Amino acid sequence: MVIINNLTFNQDYSCVSVSTTKYHKIFNCDPFGEFYSSYQGSSGTKGDKPNDNDKEIIIDKGNGNEYNKIGEDSPTSYLKMLFSTSLTIIIPQNESVGNRLLKIYNLKQNMKICELTFPSHIIDVKLNRKRLCVILESGQIYIYDLSCVRLIKVLEISSFSSKDSEEETHQKLFVGDLGAEDKSLLVLPISNITDQTDLFNTENGVNVTRASDSNILTSLKPLIEFTENKIDKDIITLEDLQKDSNGWVLIYDTIKLKPRLIYKAHDSSLAKITISNDNKKIATASSKGTIIRVCHLESSDDEDVSKPFNISQIINLRRGHNIAKVNCLSFSLDNSILGCGSESNTIHFFRLSKQPHESFEYEEDPANESDPDDEDRSSEDLNQNLANLLISKTPDASAPDQKDSAKSSYFGVLKKKVEGSSRFMNNPYTQTIVRNLPYKNYFENLIWEPPRRAFAYVKLPEYTPPQLFNLHQSKNKVAIGFANTNNNGHLIMLASYQTGQFYHYQLPKPSDQPEPSDSRHECNLIAQYSLL
């Protein structure tokens, strides 16, 4: 039986790779076709090959070693492509010594360029044109300069293995992402950071495994956005953040080797993080999975790395009311749409850019008929929407559009409804919420928007036998990709871990007429293929 270990789109969604217990393959996405298999190398008989005109990265180790050809018997844990170039990262699956070997290949020539051996199991690999990040089960992130495969930094983080019992060891998944763009931002949960994580040593290639010191722990406050009043201290340590919540996020610059921002995304622990292609949007999902959060990053015009990023906007997206594990978040190429896959077997699509006919008029969030159990509903829904994710704008009385902005904001509409209603404002529950607002001194300047609902969805036409759930540590796991078409909008591409099926769906076109906020359209299935 062939078991899928990993399904991965390349950075521009032009190709999808499948790694299995027997082989690995690469397929062109649109039009669909296999163009590489470890059984036969580059076939070129099905579909198109990658675009060789794309910028290639040439790695010459200069050591005179012979390049080894890829063997036919190739059980593979991971295969990662670099855009549409021939440079490919392969992690062979080895039951005896573990997944400790990383090989870099030139698939166009079917040759191995170099290989790296690590002291622990490799649980994930992230790469772009500048950086290669290798994440180990023992709790290290090895950061390489990909142009010469030179180790420049090792981040010591918490271990990804935990014992469920005395005999059984459970491997946790890596929650984080590396931006595809050359700025190479690495986004991590603060819960992964330890006292030994050397975040502030910027010496390139020197003492790459140097441990942290006490001065580092006193340097976090200048990096923090959206700090709640209860930890508003002169010195904010790593321990303070981790005691407050597991939902804090760290943005680390792998080019300058220093952190750029720390912010609180959720109250509960993080289940999924992804960063957009332009490094300007970060989407996060908590372990509850009811609310997805998209943060818009802004950096200074002079690109001064001593200054932290700013968060200019936060968009709240409601996946649903029932708790479900989110296992995939993916931005479209133009960053206007976010796809979200979860164990509910429904893939939701959210529009991040506001349509011309849309407004911030408040509408009651309709009851979800499929969520009858209020006990399972996330506590995030109220306290985080009201307290943690309100964006504070500096008061500017001279701004000409300040009144118009307030009128169109969610808060402006709600304020009109409750203005003059002392019963609402004097309600003990309301007063408790207001007291906990992190920016209550800027209450009049908050831009407050209700969570957006998905405008489109896909319900996969497949059944997953229960015995397959444990193979992938999450039910109904998928990989989501996007392709732009000339006239018909976005083409959705879905790859299923459980069945090995590859689907093409058509995303509905935006309507020219206003629609109800809870209006959702099912995507049309165009084609279905097998990746096995």
UniProtKB/Swiss-Prot annotation:
Compositional bias annotation for Acidic residues: 361-378
Top-level taxon: Eukaryota
Region (Disordered): 360-380
Any one biological process term the GO annotation gives: protein transport
Compartments, record wording: Cytoplasm; Membrane; Vacuole membrane
GO CC terms in record: vacuolar membrane
Membrane topology category: Peripheral membrane protein
Motif position, L/FRRG motif: 317-321
UniProt note: domains: Contains a beta-propeller domain involved in specific binding to phosphatidylinositol 3,5-bisphosphate (PIP2). The L/FRRG motif is essential for the cytoplasm to vacuole transport (Cvt) pathway and for the recruitment of ATG8 and ATG16 to the PAS in nutrient-rich medium and in both its recruitment to and dissociation from the PAS under starvation conditions.
Functional description taken from the UniProt entry: Required for cytoplasm to vacuole transport (Cvt) vesicles formation and mitophagy. Involved in binding of phosphatidylethanolamine to ATG8 and in recruitment of ATG8 and ATG5 to the pre-autophagosomal structure. Protects ATG8 from ARG4-mediated cleavage.
Family: Belongs to the WD repeat PROPPIN family.
Protein name: Autophagy-related protein 21
Organism annotation: Debaryomyces hansenii (strain ATCC 36239 / CBS 767 / BCRC 21394 / JCM 1990 / NBRC 0083 / IGC 2968) (Yeast)
